[in-house]
Amino acid sequence: MGFTSAWAVTAHPDDVMADVRPHVLPRIERHRQFPETRRAWRAWCADPLPDHRDWDALRQLPGKHEAITSFLRLTSMIPLDELHCSGDRGVHLYDLWEGADDAVRPYLGFYRKDYAVSALFHAIGPERAALLPGWCGDFALTAEEVRRSLPAVEEALGFTPVERVAAEERIWLDDLPDDEPVLDGPLRCWREAADTGLGLLGVNVHLY
């Protein structure tokens, strides 16, 4: 059965984030603390996966099929889906996306039968991924938290020319010509939000 996922990074003033955070942060933290989630994260950190183009052959080796499946589940399990699917939770994602502050152009990654966060984390590896606030693409940050976290995000998503080529080779997403690359969009949002004094909301959800 097909699906379409979205990873959206949108900017909002602190008064909006104050309303959003009580709905978002507990769900993120609860998911982060699941034993299955922690085991999958530790396994990926201990043994990062090789180039995705080798996965078909790798799946034939003992334990490797499980390692690939574990990583994909880790980066595609979506605790905030209920905020998108239900209108009686005190916050609705479509309303937040439509009401994002115009000072920062949102990053919107829409993919059919795929996940932007999975591809990004595979491209940058666990050491860089661990520098990103929140959990696997989900976060709700005040303006001050955006400013404080910017150096870590710069370290996670900033690349030398050689590093950029290597990261691009590990991205498996099929972008359209007008799509902003997942290697660029989130960092741009962070920089612009830090410059304009806005908070950031990152949400990884299924659209349908």
Question: Residue ranges of each PLM-predicted region?
Answer:
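Acidic (Asp/Glu-rich) sequence patches and key acidic residues
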Residues: 1-188, 192, 196, 207-208
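Short, well-ordered beta-strand elements
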Residues: 200-205
